[in-house]
UniProtKB/Swiss-Prot annotation:
Protein name: DNA-directed RNA polymerase subunit Rpo5
GO molecular function annotation: DNA binding; DNA-directed RNA polymerase activity
E.C. number(s) listed in UniProt: 2.7.7.6
Subunit relationships: Part of the RNA polymerase complex.
Protein keywords: Cytoplasm, DNA-directed RNA polymerase, Nucleotidyltransferase, Transcription, Transferase
Species this protein is from: Aeropyrum pernix (strain ATCC 700893 / DSM 11879 / JCM 9820 / NBRC 100138 / K1)
Catalytic reactions of this protein: RNA(n) + a ribonucleoside 5'-triphosphate = RNA(n+1) + diphosphate
Length: 90
């Protein structure tokens, strides 16, 4: 990816309709999974090839935290498990 493409891609994260995304550290991921009482693969998935995952340099097995604005809660956190989809396999 060229530096120009990378720079223009970063603008995606700054768009008003794109919620904040961040990679969780291992410690944070363990804490979130304990709090939710689930295993990582039970989280909704996000492809390692997703534009946001690529910008964050996410690897399969990582967990991405998404913070969305909510009219009722003010702010809501969602989590996605990064997976490496193989071509032709869903």
């Amino acid at each position: 990816m060229s530096s120009k493409t990378r720079k223009s891609s970063r603008v995606i994260l700054e768009h008003e309709y794109v919620p904040e995304h961040r990679l969780l550290s291992i410690e944070e991921a363990v804490q979130v999974l304990k709090m939710l009482g689930i295993k990582p693969w039970q989280l909704p998935k996000i492809s390692v090839n997703d534009p946001i995952a690529r910008l964050l340099k996410a690897k399969p097995g990582d967990i991405i935290e998404i913070t969305r604005r909510s009219y009722t809660a003010g702010e809501a956190k969602y989590y996605r498990f990064v997976v490496a989809y193989q071509k032709g396999v869903k």
